[in-house]
From Swiss-Prot:
Site note Not glycosylated, residues: 306
Residue ranges annotated for the LRRCT domain, each copy included: 299-347
Identification of the protein by name: Leucine-rich alpha-2-glycoprotein
Gene: LRG1
Pfam families noted in UniProt: LRR_1, LRR_8
GO cellular component: extracellular exosome; extracellular region; extracellular space; ficolin-1-rich granule lumen; intracellular membrane-bounded organelle; membrane; specific granule lumen; tertiary granule lumen
Alphabetical UniProt keywords: Disulfide bond, Glycoprotein, Leucine-rich repeat, Repeat, Secreted, Signal
Length: 347
C-alpha cells in the first residue's frame, strides 16, 4: 500500500482476473490499520503481484497517467462534467472502472478503447442523459454496466452495440418513460436486469427476448398498470421478480406460466383487487418451493369468491408469505380490514 502521484510510474506486474471493489476497500482499511499515511493530494494505491488498484477521491488529484499494471481504478466524488481525454491511456489491463458521483454529463466515443479487458463499469450518480454510439466497440468482455441514478429519459439500442458478454445491466433510478423494441436482443448472457425506480408505464412485448438465462428482474418503483401474459414467457429460469411499488391493477392469466424456478416474487404496494384463476398454478411447482418468499401486501384486495384460487394457494404457501399483517382486505364490508390469510383460512 502506498500513495501515488503522477510523477511516480510503476513497472507492470501480473493480472488478477477480477479484483472486487469490496476487497479493495478492505485492503485500504487494513493498510490504514498498519499505520500507512497518504498525502492528501495523492491517490490511494494497493500494489500486489496481480496488479495495481487505485482509488482517487477529493482532495486527491485526478491522475494524469496510470501504471501499466492497473487492474482497478476508482475516480469518485469529484465535481466533474467531463473526464480527462487521456485518463485511461496505457492502462490496457484495466478490469474495473468506478466513476460514481462525479456529475459527468457526457463521455467520449473513444473513452473505453484503451481498456479492452474491462469487465466492470460503474457510472452511478452522474448526470448522463445519453451515451455516444460506439462507446462499447472495444468492450467485448464487459460483464457489468451500472448506469444507476443518472438522467436518462430515453434509451437507444445503438448506445449498447459492442457488448457481447454483458451479464448485469443496471438502469435503475433514471427517468425512463419507455424502452425501445429489441433493447436486449443481443444480450444472450444477461443474468440481471434492473429497471427499477423509473417512470415506465408500459414495456415492449419483446423486452425479454434475447437473454437465455435471466435470473433477476427488477421493475419496482415504476408506473406499470398491466402485466401481460407473454412478457415473462421467454425466461423460465427467472428466480427473482420485483414488481412492487407500481400501479398494477391487472395481471393477465398465464403471466407467470412456466416460472417454475422462481425463488422470490414481490407484488406489494400495487392496485390489485383481484387476480385471475390459475395465475399461481406454476409458482413453486412441482419441485420448487419459492424458497425466498413472496409479498402481496399493500394492495386493495376484494376478498370475495373471486379470490378462491388465491386462498388455496396462500394456504399452501403461507410459511413463505411476507408482511402477512399488512396484506388485508379492502372489501367487501363484512371482511374489510381483515387479513387476507385469515379470510383464506375461513373458506
Amino acid at each position: 500500500m502506498s500513495s501515488w502521484s503522477r510523477q511516480r510510474p510503476k513497472s507492470p506486474g501480473g493480472i488478477q482476473p477480477h479484483v472486487s471493489r469490496t476487497l479493495f476497500l478492505l485492503l485500504l482499511l487494513a493498510a490504514s490499520a498498519w499505520g500507512v499515511t497518504l498525502s492528501p493530494k495523492d491517490c490511494q494505491v494497493f500494489r500486489s503481484d496481480h496488479g495495481s488498484s487505485i482509488s482517487c477521491q477529493p482532495p486527491a488529484e485526478i491522475p494524469g497517467y496510470l501504471p501499466a499494471d492497473t487492474v482497478h481504478l476508482a475516480v469518485e466524488f469529484f465535481n466533474l462534467t467531463h473526464l480527462p481525454a487521456n485518463l485511461l491511456q496505457g492502462a490496457s489491463k484495466l478490469q474495473e472502472l468506478h466513476l460514481s458521483s462525479n456529475g459527468l454529463e457526457s463521455l467520449s466515443p473513444e473513452f473505453l478503447r484503451p481498456v479492452p479487458q474491462l469487465r466492470v463499469l460503474d457510472l452511478t450518480r452522474n448526470a448522463l442523459t445519453g451515451l455516444p454510439p460506439g462507446l462499447f466497440q472495444a468492450s467485448a468482455t464487459l460483464d457489468t454496466l451500472v448506469l444507476k441514478e443518472n438522467q436518462l429519459e430515453v434509451l437507444e439500442v445503438s448506445w449498447l452495440h459492442g457488448l457481447k458478454a454483458l451479464g448485469h445491466l443496471d438502469l435503475s433510478g433514471n427517468r425512463l418513460r419507455k424502452l425501445p423494441p429489441g433493447l436486449l436482443a443481443n444480450f444472450t448472457l444477461l443474468r440481471t436486469l434492473d429497471l427499477g425506480e423509473n417512470q415506465l408505464e408500459t414495456l415492449p412485448p419483446d423486452l425479454l427476448r434475447g437473454p437465455l438465462q435471466l435470473e433477476r428482474l427488477h421493475l419496482e418503483g415504476n408506473k406499470l398498470q398491466v402485466l401481460g401474459k407473454d412478457l415473462l414467457l421467454p425466461q423460465p429460469d427467472l428466480r427473482y421478480l420485483f414488481l412492487n411499488g407500481n400501479k398494477l391493477a391487472r395481471v393477465a392469466a398465464g403471466a407467470f406460466q412456466g416460472l417454475r424456478q422462481l425463488d422470490m416474487l414481490d407484488l406489494s404496494n400495487n392496485s390489485l383487487a383481484s387476480v385471475p384463476e390459475g395465475l399461481w398454478a406454476s409458482l413453486g411447482q412441482p419441485n420448487w418451493d419459492m424458497r425466498d418468499g413472496f409479498d402481496i401486501s399493500g394492495n386493495p384486495w376484494i376478498c370475495d369468491q373471486n379470490l378462491s384460487d388465491l386462498y388455496r394457494w396462500l394456504q399452501a404457501q403461507k410459511d413463505k408469505m411476507f408482511s402477512q399483517n399488512d396484506t388485508r382486505c379492502a372489501g367487501p364490508e363484512a371482511v374489510k380490514g381483515q387479513t387476507l390469510l385469515a379470510v383464506a383460512k375461513s373458506q
